[in-house]
């Protein structure tokens, strides 16, 4: 089976024969090339056709001809802005900035606006300062004025760290405001304005309320040197030992002489105040031993010889080992990271790097097509290779050589062994099928997504023996309960509604991992960490509340680089099938780990696979499950290893479903 259908390969051949000039091929072939992403930069004459095919094609046109509303739609459908979309967005930046607050929000999230842009937006009253601050307070580094009500409203909606940043950019901040915010929202008043507070009792209350936040550094100097204040803080520190508050210790060190601190705290003074103190470990009291062990990281850094001797002492005396400990004891406020970015993480051996290497090699020596095919083999069956090749800076002759190779790629049909089981390599075949038929599949899914499955009269539902929700009354502690819930989930999916977050993780299945180079380093047992408190507990009528239409599902928003995604429809069809596989894996994993049920595993796996097919209206197909599935699933649970054979079985299931939906079965 070829990667591309015959008509797409023919259109690509025509494009190659025209030296990659898409304007010189027929309109029929142009539409095919657009549908399959077989193009590079596009001419003005194809604007409407390209935008109708996929809104993100807007980035491949000269910026001066692009409609601003199309850029907005493209930004809304992206999670990362690549160099092409960034270029057209910056070209039309002024128009985008006055296109409404939602567009401004997108531009901020994509880092398309400078500090001066934000200042202009506020000064010209295009958007309110509070709106921008709620998006990302750290973007604003110039002074602003807000009313008390606006400040309080902001504090309710932004993180603590952002509030502290807000204090630094307000012209009209006063003591009453930060004290009120501390009382009502428990945000530390760490601002110079706090030094105006002279009430010693209130100062003590604030310091002891926020011992980790260094409020002590902003206390009025007269209060800091008050004997009563010093004694109260020292008593507080002593009361909480062996827990240490570095900021308070630094304060005590600044107001009490070293000799007095050493006399009172002895070996503790090394960790608390970074003072020098020598002692024999045999003389340590039990309280001192506990303190040293809890704070061993301080001794590792400040008195390593003592720390090593203490470890040896505990090993000999108590036959246990004190591990290395490290870490900053002071809480630091971390700035929230945007879910969107203009930064693309580049692989060390990206396609562009390899193409450049081939191009340079051709200039210096003869390079055979076999050599090129071998070098780019790791990108075999990647549907975006053609587009990325045409967008690259390499010589046109090198581009044509690569395109000829990609045009004739076939899906692999050789057999391979997975833990002694001979299976066919089905994933490439399935991905090729999806590439061939993704528009038909997407058309079907969107045609049924608004139908209520309990009363749906589509051809698939009419063929079912049971058309209502099975899991309305079910016991998820039993196999029947799990299968009933899986049946309902799958029926919803077939009607265009999916749960991308079933186990608390998105898109961890094999299709998105392989197709979009989403290398999940986490083991499966780590991915399933929250399965006990996830949507796996939802059943019956409550299932629908956890679902989203396939048309609203994350597609480009899932991936690091939009250049790695062919188009929106293709990505969503991949997500649809990937989600069904996730349902299968999660159901089996839940039975094994949460219910601790390992009886008749092979039989249960078979039931899961056939339940999914039945829910999709495929009633007369059979998937044979090998006995060795039980050993593989034990390894999956115990070691988190990828269940290759189970993936193979699941991919066989979605291949059958795909063929059935497409009418090619």
From Swiss-Prot:
Q: Which residues form a coiled coil?
A: none
Q: Which domain of life is it from?
A: Viruses
The UniProt entry, under InterPro entries, shows: Poxvirus_E2/O1, Poxvirus_O1
Xref: Pfam families: Pox_E2-like (PF04497)
Q: Subcellular localization, per the record? A: Membrane
Q: Where are the transmembrane segments?
A: 573-595
Does the keyword field hold Transmembrane? yes
| Any single Gene Ontology cellular-component annotation | membrane
Specify where it is mainly localized. membrane
**Membrane-topology annotation of the record:** Single-pass membrane protein
Keyword tags: Early protein, Membrane, Transmembrane, Transmembrane helix
Relate the induction remark in this record.
Expressed in the early phase of the viral replicative cycle.
| Sequence similarity | Belongs to the orthopoxvirus OPG074 family.
Give the protein's recorded name.
Answer: Protein OPG074
From which source organism is this entry? Monkeypox virus
């Amino acid at each position: 089976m070829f990667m591309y259908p015959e008509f797409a390969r023919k259109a690509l051949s025509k494009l190659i024969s025209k030296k990659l000039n898409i304007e010189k091929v027929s309109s029929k072939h142009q539409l095919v090339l657009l549908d399959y992403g077989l193009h590079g930069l596009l001419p003005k004459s194809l604007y409407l056709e390209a935008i109708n095919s996929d809104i993100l094609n807007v980035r491949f046109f000269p910026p001066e001809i692009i409609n601003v509303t199309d850029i907005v739609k493209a930004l809304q459908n992206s999670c990362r802005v690549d160099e092409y979309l960034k270029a057209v967005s910056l070209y039309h930046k002024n128009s985008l900035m006055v296109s409404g607050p939602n567009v401004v929000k997108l531009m901020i999230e994509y880092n398309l606006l400078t500090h001066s842009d934000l200042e202009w937006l506020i000064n010209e009253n295009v958007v309110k300062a509070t709106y921008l601050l709620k998006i990302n307070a750290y973007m604003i580094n110039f002074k602003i004025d807000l009313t008390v009500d606006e400040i309080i409203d902001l504090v309710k909606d932004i993180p603590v760290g952002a509030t502290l940043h807000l204090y630094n950019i307000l012209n009209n901040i006063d003591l009453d405001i930060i004290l009120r915010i501390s009382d009502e929202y428990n945000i530390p008043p760490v601002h110079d304005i706090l030094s105006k507070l002279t009430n010693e009792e209130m100062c003590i209350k604030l310091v002891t309320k926020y011992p980790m936040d260094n409020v002590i550094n902003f206390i009025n100097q007269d209060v800091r040197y008050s004997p009563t204040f010093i004694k109260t803080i020292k008593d507080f520190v002593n009361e909480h030992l062996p827990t240490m508050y570095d900021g308070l210790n630094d304060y005590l060190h600044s107001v009490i002489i070293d000799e007095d601190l050493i006399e009172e705290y002895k070996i503790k003074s090394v960790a608390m105040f970074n003072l020098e103190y020598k002692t024999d470990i045999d003389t340590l009291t039990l309280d001192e031993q506990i303190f040293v062990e809890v704070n061993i990281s301080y001794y590792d850094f400040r008195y390593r010889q003592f720390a090593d001797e203490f470890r040896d002492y505990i090993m000999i005396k108590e036959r246990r080992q004190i591990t290395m400990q490290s870490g900053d004891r002071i809480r630091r406020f971390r700035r929230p990271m945007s879910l969107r970015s203009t930064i693309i993480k580049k692989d060390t051996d990206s396609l562009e790097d390899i193409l450049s290497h081939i191009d340079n090699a051709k200039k210096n020596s003869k390079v055979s097509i076999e050599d090129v095919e071998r070098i780019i083999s790791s990108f075999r069956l990647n549907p975006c290779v053609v587009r990325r090749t045409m967008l690259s800076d390499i010589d046109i002759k090198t581009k044509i050589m690569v395109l000829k190779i990609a045009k004739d790629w076939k899906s692999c049909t050789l057999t391979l062994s997975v833990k002694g089981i001979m299976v066919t390599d089905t994933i490439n075949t399935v991905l090729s099928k999806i590439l061939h038929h993704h528009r038909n599949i997407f058309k079907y899914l969107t045609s049924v997504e608004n139908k209520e499955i309990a009363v749906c009269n589509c051809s698939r539902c009419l063929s079912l023996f049971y058309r209502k929700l099975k899991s309305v009354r079910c016991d998820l502690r039993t196999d029947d309960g799990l299968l009933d819930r899986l049946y309902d989930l799958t029926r919803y999916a077939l009607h265009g509604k999916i749960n991308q977050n079933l186990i608390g993780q998105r898109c961890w299945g094999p299709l998105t991992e392989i197709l979009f180079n989403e290398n999940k380093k986490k083991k499966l047992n780590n991915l399933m960490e929250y399965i006990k408190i996830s949507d796996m507990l939802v059943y019956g009528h409550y299932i629908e509340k956890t679902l989203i239409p396939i048309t609203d599902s994350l597609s480009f928003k899932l991936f690091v680089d939009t250049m790695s995604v062919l188009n929106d429809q293709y990505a969503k069809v991949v997500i649809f099938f990937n989600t069904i596989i996730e349902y299968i894996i999660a159901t089996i994993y839940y039975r094994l780990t949460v219910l601790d049920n390992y009886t008749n595993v092979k039989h249960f796996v078979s039931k899961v696979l056939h339940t999914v097919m039945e829910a999709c209206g495929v009633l007369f197909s059979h998937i044979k499950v090998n006995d060795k599935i039980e050993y593989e699933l034990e390894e999956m649970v115990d070691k988190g290893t990828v269940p290759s054979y189970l993936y193979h079985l699941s991919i066989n299931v979605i291949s059958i479903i795909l063929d059935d939906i497409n009418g090619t079965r």
